[in-house]
Amino acid sequence: RQRQMCIRDSLLGKNKFNHWASLAQVGLANAGTATEQICGIGIPALSVPGKGPQFTKSFAKRQQRLLGGSVSLCESKDIFHEKLLYLLKNKKFRVRQGQIGKERMGDPGASKIIADFITSKLK
C-alpha cells in the first residue's frame, strides 16, 4: 500500500507531466498541446485525430509538419499498430524521431522569455 501511494504521488498531480511522460518510449496523442509537449521532451508520438472540432485530421497533418518526424499521423488502427511496433522495435529510429521533436520545440522556458519580452516592451 505504501509503495502504491509513493508511485501515485510521484506520477499524479501538478507539474508531473515531464516525470511520467519521460518514462514512455512512445506517446499516443490526440490533443494539440500535449503532443507538442511530449515531442518536446524527446518522446516520439503517434497522432490519432478524432471527430471533435479541435483535433481534426487537418490539424494533425499541420502539426505533423510543424513537429517533423517526431509525430506521425495514424489514420487507421492498422497504421497505428504498424507504426507503434516499428517505433518499439527500432530504438535508433525512435531516439532520432524524439530528437527531432526536441529540436523543433526548443529548450524549455520559451513562454516565460516571450512573456518577459512583451512585458518589457509595454513598460
Residue ranges and their predicted role:
Residues 1-4, 8-123:
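Nucleotide-activated sugar donor-binding and catalytic core shared by glycosyltransferases
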